[in-house]
A protein has these predicted regions:
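Residue-level signature of catalytic and energy-coupling elements of molecular machines
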Residues: 38, 98, 230
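Accessory alpha-helical/coil subdomains and C-terminal extensions
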Residues: 8-9, 16-35, 46-199
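C-terminal non-catalytic interaction/assembly regions of soluble proteins
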Residues: 156-305
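Alpha-helix initiation/capping motif
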Residues: 11, 55, 108-109, 118, ...
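Alpha/propeptide regions of enzymes that mature by internal proteolysis
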Residues: 1-6
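Short, glycine/acidic-rich beta->alpha junctions
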Residues: 13, 89-90, 222-226
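Acidic, glycine-rich active-site loops and adjacent beta-strand->loop/helix elements
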Residues: 12-14, 39-43, 87-88, 112, ...
Length: 305
């Protein structure tokens, strides 16, 4: 039918489908090139270091605008806000928004790289930040949590929250039907009552409103380069690859076979929690109880350690 090129546009699921299509066409000796364009606000496709997926920067920009407004509300009202951001397995969006807004606590899946993720650990991180700010004489704050943490929680762990979920055909809780921010806010409020700590918190969900915002200049230029890059790679005969564009605008192929497992599933790019950037954000911006705070924290917590 004279089809020469299949262009797929999307995130890791679409990229995985593109990989399997490429494998199928190669097995059938079908001469159709396939080039994938990395588009997702989750920023979790395994592009070279420092290269975002297109759409991420625009979503982050809108998220920062909303998160800054929320933080100002917290300051003027003396309250806390528990914010949740999209992210699936990776915490790029929550990390990018939280770091840009100087949030005192950013909770992403990658920070649990040496321990199991549990609801209890997340609640303790939030309470720790609240108490630390009280010690510092600051009566407000905000925490942002990546919804990706739910990806690593067992069904039992989720059900033990006491939240009433609907269930899919396989008996799994349907997380898409509930606000993650509301879940954590309810659980934190219950714990604060148990601890007799007076803190008011409110939930804010940063969800679908980030997905279709007007693209910022970075993404307009970046997407243009990726589109032109597809044509360049097509003319050069490349197939079964993703188009990439580095910070100076040079386009190159990233072969899908190099970033997919044996089943053709493209592996997500997670936040590099061991990077200097992550270390500086968590060491410089995050506020939580440390050993030198134990005595002061004992006014609020029986066992601050």
């Amino acid at each position: 039918n004279d089809v020469k090129l299949l262009v797929t546009i999307g995130g890791d699921d679409t990229a995985s489908t593109a990989t399997r299509i490429s494998q199928f066409m190669a097995s059938k000796n079908i001469k159709v090139q396939n080039i994938h364009v990395p588009k997702t606000i989750d920023n979790d496709l395994p592009l070279p270091e420092g290269q975002p997926t297109f759409g991420y920067q625009s979503a982050k920009e809108e998220g920062v605008r909303l998160a800054q407004t929320v933080y100002e509300d917290a300051r003027t009202s003396g309250n806390w806000f528990i914010v949740s951001a999209m992210g699936r397995e990776a915490g790029h969006l929550a990390f990018g928004i939280g770091a840009s807004c100087h949030y005192p606590m950013i909770v992403i899946p990658e920070m649990f790289n040496k321990t199991e993720i549990t609801i209890e650990k997340i609640i303790r991180l939030i309470i720790s930040s609240m108490v630390k700010r009280k010690i510092l004489g600051i009566d407000y704050g905000a925490v942002i949590i990546s919804e990706g943490v739910f990806h690593f929680l067992s069904d039992r762990e989720i059900l033990n929250t006491g939240i009433n979920f609907t269930f899919d055909d396989h008996g799994h809780p349907e997380l898409g039907n509930v606000s993650k921010a509301h879940i954590f806010n309810i659980l934190v409020q219950k714990r604060l009552i148990d601890l007799k700590i007076t803190v008011k918190s409110r939930p804010v969900e940063l969800g679908y409103e980030l997905r279709c915002v007007r693209p910022i200049g970075f993404d307009l230029m970046y997407c243009n380069l990726l589109g032109l890059g597809v044509k360049k790679l097509f003319d050069q005969g490349y197939t079964a690859c993703m188009v990439t564009s580095d910070p100076i605008g040079d386009c190159a192929p990233l072969f899908l076979k190099d970033v997919a497992d044996k089943n053709g599933k493209v592996q997500p790019r997670l936040v590099n929690i061991n990077s200097q950037k992550a270390a500086m954000v968590y060491q410089g911006n995050a506020q939580f109880i440390e050993e030198e705070d134990y005595e002061a924290a004992s006014s609020y917590l029986e066992h601050p350690a």
